């Protein structure tokens, strides 16, 4: 937290917030040089030792290692794993199977702290900081909006599980179907079309109810517009928010993509499967994940299963019955986005970044 705050303060001192195109840390690197910028950030961070915003001072391991990257060969990766279902086990065993990664080369152990929708409270953040101090380990943020605790031993895992339970971060969810990633969407983004976080929550609910939340080997990502902040284009199941028109009314909708993946020295963008009303998107996920879980063979990836199941277009034909809008009188909920109370309107504001500048 101290490093993050130091970066923000350094940018506030030396960065340019008046010009959107240059309101980026990369421009400080370009004009100041990475070595000079790093030195100023570290200087700012040391100043925070006495700051009330970071109780307890800076952990010794942070001072010792600074901002050095993890280094090749030590990063945790779940690519290429065998999809599994882990129902019917005790809580610790389920957590171990889903959220613990063991390094084959160097014998290291890493454990994930699960953050539903990437949300974390102040108490949880400070709890993670205390775990870092107590065990002298690295804690890093992942691109799936969770935290990974690195440098653990096998003997420490039961204790770590109990500590994470205290902060409600022990749920087995990492790399499982329930680990849905979403951009902020219309909650806070001026150029978002739909409430992508609301859809992510609805998908999680639907998967839980269908008993499919702990199906492994499938990643679900959502963006609230055509931009790729939610990385929907490189996920097994991706959604991008769009405006739909039905019965003379605007309604929230999504374009569903299938088959995107990144890993094993290759990348593939998801292909269009079908368009859906926002309120039918969760059911489409339940159908696809359920079909994948029941039909896959041992070790088969989602993309391999999709390839032998007719591809995105083939699977999309099985979902066409969901692309139906009832009239506003029959079901007005179809014309109101998640977490909203009034009729849907695709209002696009001024971008806060350089995306549309």
Residue ranges and their predicted role:
Residues 1-357:
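Peripheral terminal and linker regions in Fe-S/redox and tRNA-modifying enzymes
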């Amino acid at each position: 937290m101290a490093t993050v705050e130091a970066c923000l303060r350094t940018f506030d001192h030396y960065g340019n917030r008046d010009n959107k195109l240059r309101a980026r840390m990369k421009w400080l690197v370009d004009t100041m040089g990475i070595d000079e910028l790093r030195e100023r950030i570290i200087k700012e961070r040391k100043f925070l030792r006495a700051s009330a915003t970071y109780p307890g001072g800076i952990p010794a391991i942070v001072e010792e290692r600074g901002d050095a990257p993890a280094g090749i060969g030590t990063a945790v990766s779940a690519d290429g794993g065998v999809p599994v279902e882990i129902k019917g086990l005790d809580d610790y065993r389920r957590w171990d199977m889903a959220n613990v990664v063991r390094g084959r080369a160097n014998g290291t152990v890493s454990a994930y702290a699960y953050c539903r929708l990437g949300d974390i409270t102040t108490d949880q953040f400070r709890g993670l900081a205390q775990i870092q101090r107590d065990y002298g380990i690295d804690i890093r943020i992942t691109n799936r909006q969770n935290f990974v605790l690195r440098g653990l031993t096998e003997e420490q895992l039961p204790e770590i599980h109990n500590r994470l339970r205290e902060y409600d971060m022990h749920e087995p969810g990492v790399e499982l179907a329930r680990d849905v990633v979403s951009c902020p969407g219309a909650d806070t983004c001026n150029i978002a079309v739909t409430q992508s976080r609301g859809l992510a929550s609805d998908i999680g609910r639907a998967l839980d109810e269908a008993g499919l939340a702990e199906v492994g080997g499938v990643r679900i990502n959502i963006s609230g517009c055509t931009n790729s902040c939610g990385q929907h284009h490189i996920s097994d199941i991706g959604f991008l928010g769009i405006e739909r028109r039905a019965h003379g009314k605007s309604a929230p909708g999504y374009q569903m993509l299938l088959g995107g993946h990144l890993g094993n020295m290759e990348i593939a963008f998801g292909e269009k499967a079908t368009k859906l009303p926002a309120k039918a998107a969760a059911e489409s996920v339940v159908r696809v994940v359920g079909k994948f879980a029941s039909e896959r063979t041992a070790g088969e990836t989602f993309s391999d299963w999709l390839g032998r199941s007719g591809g995105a277009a083939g699977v999309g034909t099985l979902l066409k019955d969901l692309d139906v809008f009832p009239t506003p009188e029959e079901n007005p909920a179809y014309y109101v986005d998640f977490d909203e109370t009034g009729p849907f309107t695709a209002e696009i504001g001024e971008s806060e970044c350089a995306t549309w500048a």
